[in-house]
Curated annotation (Swiss-Prot):
Subunit structure: Tetramer of two alpha and two beta chains.
Function text: The alpha subunit is responsible for the aldol cleavage of indoleglycerol phosphate to indole and glyceraldehyde 3-phosphate.
SUPFAM superfamilies according to UniProt: Ribulose-phoshate binding barrel
Catalytic residues identified in the record: 49, 60
Lineage top rank: taxon: Bacteria
InterPro entries from the UniProt entry: Aldolase_TIM (IPR013785), RibuloseP-bd_barrel (IPR011060), Trp_synthase_alpha_AS (IPR018204), Trp_synthase_suA (IPR002028)
PANTHER family named in the record: TRYPTOPHAN SYNTHASE ALPHA CHAIN, CHLOROPLASTIC, TRYPTOPHAN SYNTHASE, ALPHA CHAIN
Reaction it catalyzes: (1S,2R)-1-C-(indol-3-yl)glycerol 3-phosphate + L-serine = D-glyceraldehyde 3-phosphate + L-tryptophan + H2O
The protein's name in its UniProt record: Tryptophan synthase alpha chain
Cellular component terms (Gene Ontology): cytosol
Organism: Cupriavidus taiwanensis (strain DSM 17343 / BCRC 17206 / CCUG 44338 / CIP 107171 / LMG 19424 / R1) (Ralstonia taiwanensis (strain LMG 19424))
Pathway named in the protein's UniProt entry: Amino-acid biosynthesis; L-tryptophan biosynthesis; L-tryptophan from chorismate: step 5/5
Upper taxonomic lineage: Bacteria, Pseudomonadati, Pseudomonadota, Betaproteobacteria, Burkholderiales
Family note: Belongs to the TrpA family.
Length: 265
């Protein structure tokens, strides 16, 4: 059982919803990343999604694009991101860490080298936004061979064939994008999410985390009423952009604690 599977099994046993926050590695400044990861856990995160900065993040809205640009301007690389995971693991061996990003940095390192390095660092899952599931069997197999879960996105526009393709290669959990468009865009239609998730579960026997458009405790609680987990990203990245750096760790922990409280209410 992977660390992600154990986490979701424990949540189900406690009848709790998962909280999966996203931050961009190296933003707002490289020296804060590990402290921010620990702050997320202290605030009640169950899984951490750590964004690998990339120069052309096509699925991301302006907030996360700016975070990527800030991190890249400070020299953050995939190798550096793995080093931060390794540092985080020195004192936290329980909370799953999922790397989220794009194919280019992985392919530059080499898929096999990346799989070995990520696994050794303590990464639990990898979500590559621009890897189509239909062409991903060897990569997904490589991840699993190294004890990591390959995680995939599904959207309101995903066909049954796409859902089946994802179900064949995915493990850990699925990330359902609740809106068409890029991260951080408009508000969520809860009814359409509630109608869609049972259809996904018919094909894939995996927990489903829902993200894109979750901005506050109220939205998180509403989504938590229909999903296995809530993914929150752009709102956190915006918070870090707007907060003086010396207050970033405290502000992030407080915000996540509010979301946790709403999910558990």
């Amino acid at each position: 059982m992977s660390r992600i599977q154990k986490t979701f099994a424990a949540l189900a046993a406690q009848q709790k919803k998962g909280l999966i926050p996203f931050i961009t590695a190296g933003d707002p400044e490289p020296g804060l990343t590990v402290a921010l990861m620990h702050a997320l856990v202290a605030g009640g995160a169950d899984v951490i999604e750590l964004g690998v900065p990339f120069s052309d993040p096509m699925a991301d809205g302006p907030v996360i694009q700016r975070a990527s640009e800030r991190a890249l301007a400070q020299g953050v690389s995939l190798t550096q991101v793995l080093q931060w995971v390794r540092e985080f693991r020195q004192t936290n061996t329980d909370t799953p860490v999922v790397l989220m990003g794009y194919a280019n940095p992985i392919e530059r390192m080499g898929e096999a080298a990346f799989a070995a390095a990520a696994s050794a660092a303590g990464v639990d899952g990898v979500l590559v936004v621009d890897y189509p599931p239909e062409e991903c069997e060897s990569f997904a197999g490589l991840m699993r061979d190294h004890g990591m879960d390959p995680i995939f996105l599904l959207a309101p526009t995903s066909t049954d064939a796409r859902i089946e393709a994802v179900a064949k290669v995915a493990s850990g959990y699925l990330y359902y994008v609740s809106l068409k468009g890029v991260t951080g865009s408009a508000s969520i239609d809860l009814d359409s999410v509630a109608a869609r998730l049972p259809l996904i579960k018919q094909h894939a026997n995996l927990p489903v985390g829902v993200g894109f458009g979750i901005r506050d405790a109220q939205t998180a609680r509403a989504i938590g009423s229909v999903a296995d987990a809530v993914v929150i990203g752009s709102r956190l990245v915006q918070l870090l952009e707007d907060t003086p750096r010396e207050q970033a760790v405290t502000a992030l922990q407080s915000f996540i604690a509010e979301i946790r409280q709403a999910l558990d209410a």
